[in-house]
Amino acid sequence: MRGKTLISLLIAALLVAGCAKKQAQTGTPTTEKKWRVGVTLLTKQHPFYQELEAAMRETAEKEGIELLIQSAEFNLADQTAQVENFLTSGVDALIICPVDSAGIAGAVKKANAAKVPVFTADIAAQGGDVVCHVASDNVQGGRLAGEYLAKLLGGKGKVVIIDHPVVTSVQDRTRGFMEAISKYPDIQVVDRPPGDGVRDKAMAVTETMLQKHPDLAGIFAINDSTALGALKAVESMGRTNVVIVGYDGDPEARREILRGCALKADAVQFPRKIGSTVVEMVAKHLRGEPVPKLVPIPCDLIDKQKLEREPSP
């Protein structure tokens, strides 16, 4: 009996040694650490953020990251609570697309105190320590939009900006826009009402602007939800002489531009590039590699002629 026991123990020891040797040869650990990263998006309803999220998920899979994605749907209190819940759950890092650039600072500082690295995408945070911000070069995009609108107007006319000034990305867009049209002394920005980046509100605001400024010539819409709301107002009031330049390059806006309506052009962002890049930056940082504080993604501009030459898929 004792002999059989010794033989059994010897066999078990050999099996364990064999497994250890095999593991050493393959270099594959029995369990692989997967980083957990909390993500709070501005919204999941907008095509821009749908593309950004899809690219984040694809890149996270390659980088060995588990993404925990929630959406604030434009609600700062919800976004703050999401960050706090992520911190309580013990995530390795955070990616935030702020609802309000200044308002999110408190949540960022809580993450700093918990020593959880914070990254921002598309919209920057104003306050707290952020490891890396990845976003479109929105100043450049605003310049492209301003130059195009100035060309449409022949260098003169009254313009309104349907604004959303509580987020840094829009602040940058309007700054670039103003830089561009400042070269044209006969173009006058007569109003900058907030439309909150939402179609229905942008439509209502545009209707008010069209009534207030009967000689209005042009509109700069800070995103495509705004542009499409403005377009509906312009068409419903029969003011199709008013031209609109939007921002984002969403599929619906592209279709309207191709239709040949008052929406003439869009500054274009690349949300998939933003989404993939921010996850790559998180992975590098978690591996102990240096990352830049800012990664700007260049913008482009599309109009009917360009879309006809290079149709979107």
What are these regions (language model features)?
Residues 19-313:
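A residue-level marker of the well-folded mature domains of exported/periplasmic proteins
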